[in-house]
Amino acid sequence: MAQQPTKGGSRSGRRPRLSLDDWTAAGLQLLVTEGRTAVKISRLCDELGVTKGSFYWHFTDIDDLMKAIATRYTSQDNDAARGLTSVEELPVRERLTRMGTMLVDDRAWEAEVAVREWARSDPKVAESVRALDQRIMTVVENAFLELGFDKDEARVRAGTLVYAGIGFVYGRDGLPSPTVEQIQALLTILVRK
């Protein structure tokens, strides 16, 4: 990720030169902390200490930025930050355990909640979220296939775990958060033949 410039420009008095990644990171951060309606060109320019010309160098309008934010968040490039790429290389039981324990990491869910909420009102973002969910489902389903479950059993077990994760995203403020031990207990049930 590109380094965030300081508010008001660089120490030399010259305005920082921002990349597309800088803009999408700043937009995503604002989306997470304040919601979709807070993401405005003037607000981001103030936050980043640059003029609107810098924004228009990368984007045609705010919708173009929002598309880039959605793409960044749900892309396979972000799978490393989400932990998907590293878990695929682990032994299968450890892979499931790692994915399960990701469910109790509050930091990961802030952006997830914001993007999923945004997807409810934007069909393009909803499509990106569906593609992300499908990638996650595939990783989990493949893990159950590796454990020797047939295709139907693997899909049902993977669905149980993936839907539990999505439910946690939406229920985490009103329901008790599962502990690592409870996640482990669920995984023990799911891997039992």
Which ranges hold each PLM region?
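N-terminal intrinsically disordered/low-complexity leader segments
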Residues: 1-18, 149
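Residues in soluble alpha-helical coiled-coils and helical-bundle/repeat scaffolds
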Residues: 60-64, 86, 120, 124, ...
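Hydrophobic alpha-helical connector segments
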Residues: 68, 79-113, 157, 161
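Amphipathic alpha-helical packing segments from all-alpha helical-bundle domains
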Residues: 78, 106-113, 123-148, 155-159
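Hydrophobic/aromatic-rich alpha-helical bundle segments in the mid-to-C-terminal region
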Residues: 126, 130, 145-193
